[in-house]
Amino acid sequence: MPAFPRAELEEMIRRFVAANDECGKDGNWDRLAAFYAPDAVYTWNNGPKYEFVARGRDEIRKWVMGTEMEGLDKWTYPYVRTLIDDQKGEIIGIWRQLAPVVDDDGKPIEIGGTGGSWFRYGGNWQWTWQRDFFDQSCAAAGFLDLMQKGKLSKKMEERMKSGSRMPGWVKRSEFDWYGTVVDREDE
């Protein structure tokens, strides 16, 4: 991966985070797809048996910003730290996951654990690769707690019931995410 000017990487993540913040406010995640190259790959782990994989901007729009965000209207994902590697053109962003409902103290309910995204920049203000990471057990417990309290959207309850039948979910044995990492340091 070629090096990119640090200022360009800083501007890219600034633009992306600003758009992410707007999407959280209005619930329209679709516009984030414009930040991905036509052949970008976006993945995350879904526990011990599954990975989520979207290949190309169309699948990212349809699945990441579509089916995977259904029921999460008005949830916000504020970024609290970004780390930039301008030699590899990569950025790691650490974020929180906040529900649009409050607890008994009036604070937004938060999914515990650490959430983050690892991006590879390809120039032209587009990501070519993204790998998200978050605490699956905290997410599951948080969503279940919200559902039991009647604070989870009906759409999200439906999604939880569908489990691994969501588009983009593949068995871990069928997808090697490490193989998608360019310029690995363990090779």
Regions found by a protein language model. Give the residues of each.
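A solvent-exposed, acidic/Ser-Thr-rich amphipathic alpha-helical stretch
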Residues: W29-I92
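Charged/polar, solvent-exposed surface patches and flexible loops
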Residues: E11, R15-A18, A34, K62, ...
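A generic structural signal for ordered alpha-helices
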Residues: P2, E10-E11, P38-Y42, I60, ...
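A beta-strand edge to alpha-helix "cap/lid" segment located at domain peripheries
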Residues: A3-F4, E68-E187
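Hydrophobic alpha-helical core bundles mediating ligand binding, dimerization, or RNAP-core interactions
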Residues: I13-N20, G24, Y36, I60, ...
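Short, low-complexity N-terminal intrinsically disordered segments enriched in polar/charged residues
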Residues: M1-A34, P38, R172-E187
